[in-house]
UniProtKB/Swiss-Prot annotation:
<dbReference type="InterPro" id="IPR036523">
    <property type="entry name" value="SurE-like_sf"/>
</dbReference>
<feature type="binding site">
    <location>
        <position position="39"/>
    </location>
    <ligand>
        <name>a divalent metal cation</name>
    </ligand>
</feature>
<keyword id="KW-0378">Hydrolase</keyword>
<comment type="function">
    <text>Nucleotidase that shows phosphatase activity on nucleoside 5'-monophosphates.</text>
</comment>
<dbReference type="InterPro" id="IPR002828">
    <property type="entry name" value="SurE-like_Pase/nucleotidase"/>
</dbReference>
<feature type="binding site">
    <location>
        <position position="9"/>
    </location>
    <ligand>
        <name>a divalent metal cation</name>
    </ligand>
</feature>
<dbReference type="InterPro" id="IPR030048">
    <property type="entry name" value="SurE"/>
</dbReference>
<dbReference type="GO" id="GO:0008254">
    <property type="term" value="F:3'-nucleotidase activity"/>
</dbReference>
<keyword id="KW-0479">Metal-binding</keyword>
<dbReference type="GO" id="GO:0004309">
    <property type="term" value="F:exopolyphosphatase activity"/>
</dbReference>
<protein>
    <recommendedName>
        <fullName>5'-nucleotidase SurE</fullName>
        <ecNumber>3.1.3.5</ecNumber>
    </recommendedName>
</protein>
<dbReference type="GO" id="GO:0046872">
    <property type="term" value="F:metal ion binding"/>
</dbReference>
<feature type="binding site">
    <location>
        <position position="8"/>
    </location>
    <ligand>
        <name>a divalent metal cation</name>
    </ligand>
</feature>
<dbReference type="GO" id="GO:0000166">
    <property type="term" value="F:nucleotide binding"/>
</dbReference>
<feature type="binding site">
    <location>
        <position position="91"/>
    </location>
    <ligand>
        <name>a divalent metal cation</name>
    </ligand>
</feature>
<keyword id="KW-0547">Nucleotide-binding</keyword>
<dbReference type="GO" id="GO:0008253">
    <property type="term" value="F:5'-nucleotidase activity"/>
</dbReference>
Length: 247
């Protein structure tokens, strides 16, 4: 397969380097990734400035842009090549539960889906970042499986890999997104109290059996199929009744 690779940690990050190394043996890869860290950029696109791809090597390009920018540009004319699959990652840190709303890694995969391609987002579920090689092997296994049994074009898989040696991985689990509590309070800068730092992610609120949190805690690779439709269908009738009461 011809695979477009991107991420939100930047084109030189260890995760994307490992991902490219893991997939290049059996697939044709092209890397189009941000020139620097763009974590938590979600699905933002750049409309107020033109974007300049810079070729680093034969199949690697960097852009001063978000992950969604990179995928969008690559698939909408810049590469002028037929791509079969979009893979983003390997992210440094988990993308579990509500994290997916903010994640540039997941957003890059979603952009691929918007543009008609099956897409996979892969994250190493730890801030230690010790076992990217494990995640690379898992990525290779998943992508090889996809190459034999194609995913539908509107599929996004959110994959989280425990940050452990491969021999500790118990297998794969298909999961749903868990949930976090509200984020921690913002923190004033120690040197300048007029500046604030965004607080840490909230603790796990829904981490029961079947969630991505539970899979990772028990050394399983979590694979969550994502959908783009954010409509809360079970509230449509309630909201309709509420609207009908407006005078």
């Amino acid at each position: 397969m011809k695979i477009l690779i991107s991420n939100d940690d930047g084109y030189q990050a260890p995760g994307i380097v490992q991902l490219a190394q893991s997939l290049t043996q059996e697939h044709e890869i092209i890397v189009v990734a941000p020139s620097e860290n763009k974590s938590a950029s979600s699905s933002s696109l750049t409309f107020d400035n033109p974007l300049r791809p810079i070729q680093i090597s034969n199949n690697v390009y960097k852009i001063d842009a978000t992950p969604s920018d990179c995928v969008h540009l690559a698939l909408c004319g810049f590469l002028n090549e037929k791509i079969d699959l979009v893979v983003t990652g390997i992210n440094f840190g988990a993308n579990l539960g509500d994290d997916v709303i903010y994640s540039g890694t997941v957003a890059g995969a979603i952009e691929g889906r918007f543009l008609g391609l099956p897409s996979v987002a892969i994250s190493l579920a730890s801030w230690k970042g010790q076992h990217f090689e494990t995640a690379g092997i898992i990525a290779k296994q998943l992508i090889n499986q996809i190459s034999h049994t194609q995913l539908s074009h509107d599929t996004v898989l959110n994959v989280n890999v425990p940050d452990v040696s491969l021999n500790y991985i118990k297998g794969f689990q298909t999961t749903r997104l868990g949930k976090r509590h509200m984020s921690e309070q913002s923190v004033a800068d120690k040197d300048d109290p007029t500046l604030y730092w965004i607080g840490e992610n909230g603790k796990e609120a829904d981490n029961g059996v079947g969630t991505d949190f539970h899979a990772i805690a028990n050394y399983y690779v979590s694979v969550t199929p994502l959908q783009i439709d954010l409509t809360k269908y079970n509230e449509i009738d309630t909201v309709s009744k509420w609207l009908n009461q407006i005078k």
